[in-house]
Amino acid sequence: MNPLVYFSSSSENSHRFVEKLQLPAIRIPIAGAREKLRVEQPYILLVPSYGGGSPVGAVPIQVIRFLNDVHNRSLIRGVIAAGNTNFGDAYCLAGDIISHKCQVPYLYRFELLGTAEDVANVRKGVTEFWQRQN
C-alpha cells in the first residue's frame, strides 16, 4: 500500500493519530533536516491546520516547503486534515487549501487527536482509496 505522508509538530497529535492507523507512513521533518524529504511513490497527505482560524498560516510551513518541490507535489493523490472546531469556519482549513491548490480530493477531516471512529474511518477509507487506484 502507498504511504501516508504527514506532518506533526512537537505536540505529536498528528503523529499519535498516524501511529493508531498502523499504515505505512512517512513523516515530514519538523525542522533542521539536512536533506529535504523526497517521496518516490504516490501518497495521501495528512496535515494539521494551524493559524487559529486565519487562512494565513493554516498550512504548516514545513508542508508548504514539501509541496513546493514539484516532484513531491506531482505524487500527492489526496489529503486528510486535522483541526480544532474552535476555529469555526476555518476548521481543518489546511485540507481545503491543499485540496484546492493541488487539485486532489479532500478525503477526511478530524478533530485534534481523532476518535476511535476516526481511526477506523481513515484506515478503511485509505485502504479503499488505494484499491480503487490500482
From Swiss-Prot:
Q: Which GO terms describe its molecular function?
A: FMN binding
Coiled-coil annotation: which residues? none
Biological-process GO terms, alphabetical: cellular response to iron ion; protein modification process
Which family does the similarity line name? Answer: Belongs to the NrdI family.
What HAMAP family does the annotation carry? NrdI (MF_00128)
Its annotated function is as follows: Probably involved in ribonucleotide reductase function.
Q: What is this protein called?
A: Protein NrdI
The upper taxonomy is: Bacteria, Pseudomonadati, Pseudomonadota, Gammaproteobacteria, Enterobacterales
